């Protein structure tokens, strides 16, 4: 066991009093685990590394855990020849990510603003695809694919379909950042001299292709997609924003934090999207810019939590120095994503083999988002009869965090701290097999994968054992009642 649990155990002696089983002395045990303030390394949430795994990220301090590796690649890199996915490349990245204890999220890009480094495949022009010339601002001439051209569009839609056939539901694939359209796949062609955004119908077909190809893996739409944000979230997508922290870096009279994000969500009817699908943040510039400009970290982080973010991507840039920065980051990362606290657990101290064991537990999500994966709460008995795992009927995806009113007039002036979610009471009636050998059993709790009962989520309590379970009590199994 990594840490001997310091549990406040209240044993109320209720022998033959509280509906005790005939012939079996029982106490009602109430366990109150000790909460931890540790930053937890949990799947599908938290700090993202950028184009490198956490093992390769020299700017990742040891006190920040990371379970997600984020990257973006050009269409041409992922389909170097017509009809040929770069599976060797993607499989290698997935394997490196898995070895680092992370999952992978990525975006596909078609339009590059870097001269002589296009994102579209070199073969696209050779097969008759229409390529257009433009400039990014006052820069040199660039080639970008015309997604409104039927040949280009059909080739790209087929690429997305095959990408999903190969990788949808891959255990190491965390989510897809729905890209393809606009500069860098960011759904805009700002400062393009000659090439506008593709037609609305083309954009819709690209969104449909991603949502059809990736039905098991979550898909996130960039918040700047405007009409396509509305369209995507109505069909199950989450959303992503790539300029968290902009408090005036582009204009003294306008910024993303006060004048765009909340308003865009309202317009797209996406305010409650977080309840069913994830929200991802990427920093505008990186956090060093925020500190150098004197922008409030507390404001930015409270805002990100209030909009129920699950991820933060600082592009693997160096962090700003100073103990006050670390303190704010620690406070933020303790809350980012889901965070489950077991507040109390009640059970009787003894039960007959072949009988029913009732466990009542109270849980609270003190994070900023739900867990979107179908992991399940389970209990483990370990004793003379070996190991027995008993699943709960609870759906942990319904354990919601607290909320604040983001439309309150004062929210954009000073976002308040996100409150914890409401406590959730779970009552499980577990059937004990009649053949289970009598004796004293350790009772452990965990949140596990349904297919193999392996614990996957760290709880915000102390006392996790080496196997990932949390042994918190004991129960005596008596021989089967005659």
Where are these regions (language model features)?
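Extracellular/luminal regions of secreted and cell-surface proteins that mediate adhesion/ECM remodeling
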Residues: 333-482
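Non-catalytic accessory regions flanking glycosidase/transglycosidase catalytic cores in CAZymes
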Residues: 26-70, 75-99, 103, 152, ...
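N-terminal substrate-binding region of glycoside hydrolase catalytic domains
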Residues: 27-151, 270-324
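Bacterial N-terminal signal peptides
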Residues: 10-20
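Sec/Tat signal peptide C-region and signal peptidase I cleavage site
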Residues: 21-25
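Substrate-binding cleft/loops of secretory-pathway carbohydrate-active enzymes
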Residues: 182-208, 213, 220-270
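Bacterial N-terminal signal peptides that target proteins for export
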Residues: 2-11
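An active-site-proximal structural segment forming one wall of the substrate-binding cleft
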Residues: 93-98, 130-177, 202-209
């Amino acid at each position: 066991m990594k840490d001997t649990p310091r549990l406040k155990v209240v044993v109320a002696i209720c022998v033959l009093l509280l509906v005790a089983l005939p012939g079996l002395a029982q106490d009602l045990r109430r366990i109150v685990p000790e909460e931890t303030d540790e930053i937890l390394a949990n799947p599908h949430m938290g700090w993202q590394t950028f184009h490198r795994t956490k093992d390769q990220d020299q700017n990742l301090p040891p006190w920040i855990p990371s379970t997600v590796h984020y990257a973006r690649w050009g269409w041409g890199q992922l389909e170097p020849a017509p009809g040929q996915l770069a599976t060797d490349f993607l499989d290698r990245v997935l394997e490196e990510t898995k070895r680092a204890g992370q999952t992978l999220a990525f975006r596909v890009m078609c339009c590059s603003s870097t001269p002589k480094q296009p994102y579209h495949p070199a073969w696209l022009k050779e097969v008759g695809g229409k390529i257009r010339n433009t400039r990014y601002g006052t820069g040199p001439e660039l080639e970008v694919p015309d997604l409104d051209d039927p040949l280009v569009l059909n080739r790209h839609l087929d690429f997305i379909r095959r990408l999903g056939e190969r990788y949808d539901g891959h255990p190491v694939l965390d989510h897809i950042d729905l890209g393809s359209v606009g500069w860098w796949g960011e759904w805009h062609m700002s400062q393009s001299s000659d090439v506008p955004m593709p037609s609305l119908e083309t954009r819709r077909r690209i969104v449909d292709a991603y949502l059809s190809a990736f039905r098991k893996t979550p898909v996130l739409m960039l918040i700047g997609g405007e009409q396509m944000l509305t369209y995507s979230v109505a069909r199950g997508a989450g959303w992503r924003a790539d300029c968290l922290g902009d408090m005036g870096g582009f204009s003294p009279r306008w910024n993303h934090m006060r004048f765009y994000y909340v308003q865009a969500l309202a317009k797209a009817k996406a305010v409650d999207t977080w309840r069913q699908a994830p929200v991802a943040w990427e920093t505008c510039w990186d956090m060093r810019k925020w500190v150098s400009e004197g922008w409030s970290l507390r404001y930015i982080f409270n805002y990100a939590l209030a909009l129920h973010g699950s991820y933060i991507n600082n592009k693997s840039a160096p962090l700003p120095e100073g103990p006050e920065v670390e303190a704010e980051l620690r406070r933020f990362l303790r809350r980012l994503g889901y965070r489950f606290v077991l507040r109390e657990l009640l059970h009787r101290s003894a039960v007959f083999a072949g009988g029913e064991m009732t466990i009542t537990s109270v849980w609270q999500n003190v994070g900023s988002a739900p867990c979107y994966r179908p992991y399940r709460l389970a209990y483990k008995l370990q004793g003379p009869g070996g190991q027995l795992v008993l699943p709960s009927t609870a759906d942990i995806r319904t354990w919601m965090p607290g909320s604040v009113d983001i439309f309150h007039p004062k929210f954009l002036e000073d976002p308040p701290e996100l409150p914890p979610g409401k406590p959730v009471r779970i009552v499980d009636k577990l059937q004990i097999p009649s053949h289970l050998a009598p004796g004293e059993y350790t009772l452990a709790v965990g949140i596990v994968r349904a297919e193999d009962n392996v614990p996957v989520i760290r709880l915000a309590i102390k006392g996790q054992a080496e196997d990932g379970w949390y042994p918190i009590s004991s129960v005596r199994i008596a021989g089967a009642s005659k």
